Structures are given as C-alpha cells and as structure tokens.
Amino acid sequence: MQQQDSGGAIVNVSSVSGTRPSPGTAAYGAAKAGLDNLTASLAIEWAPKVRVNALDVGLVRTELSHLHYNADVVAKTVPLGRLAEPDEVGNCAVFLASPMASYVTGATLAVHGGGEVPAFLREES
C-alpha cells in the first residue's frame, strides 16, 4: 500500500452466498466468505486511516439475469417482493465510501431485500 497523508475508504462487493450455501456455488461462496473476513481483518489492520466495509449483495436485476433465473419467480422468495436494481446497490456503496459513514468500518451491509422468505411461509402460486 502506498504511503499517504490522508485516509480512504474501501468498499468490497461480496454476496449473500458467503453465508448462505447454494448447490453448485461452493467455490464462489467460499470466496465471498473469505472476502467478508478480509473486510473485517483489514478494517482493524488499516484503521484509523482507512475504512474497509463490504456489501453482501443478493439477487440483482441486470440485462443478463434472465439467463440465470426467472426473476419473477425468484422475487417471490424475497421479503420485499423484487430483485434489487443496480442503482440501489450503487447507492449503498456510495454511502459506505462517503463521509456520512465516517464512523463505519469493518461492517458488512446486507443489500438483499430482507433475505429469503422461508419455504414454509411462501404462498403457493
């Protein structure tokens, strides 16, 4: 890391997959779990000059998301009833990088619409 007089803010983009297993995503989930731990560790090591935080992002509607899953079906499993929009994730990153979050470091902000509705509570279509 280059020496500097002032501090900075790092925002890592992680995933709910770091804490929520899913078939076929073991390597991805392990990498994201590692990123979550790296965030917490670097926040301690680099304080007080550098703040390090992460976003744990759930499903996001993108131009390619339809290739991976049916967004309307998946949205029914999210408490807010929809997938995130890219700008909603971006706004969270801007917040963590901004002076408004000047006392936030080592945090992981969940950007997942409330998580996942348990299967036994889902309404049948």
Indicate where each model-derived feature is located.
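Residue(s) in the substrate-gating loop at a strand-loop-helix junction
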Residues: 15
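Short C-terminal tail/terminal secondary-structure segment
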Residues: 20, 94, 105-125
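Active-site loop-to-helix junction immediately N-terminal to the catalytic Tyr of the SDR YXXXK motif
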Residues: 21-29, 41, 122-123
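A conserved structural motif in NAD(P)-dependent oxidoreductases
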Residues: 78-89, 100
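Alpha-helical segment proximal to the catalytic Tyr-Lys
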Residues: 3, 43-48, 102
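Active-site helix of classical SDR
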Residues: 6, 31
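A glycine/serine/threonine-rich, flexible loop-to-helix segment
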Residues: 57-78, 88, 118-125
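Active-site loop immediately N-terminal to the catalytic Tyr-X3-Lys motif
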Residues: 20-26, 81, 99
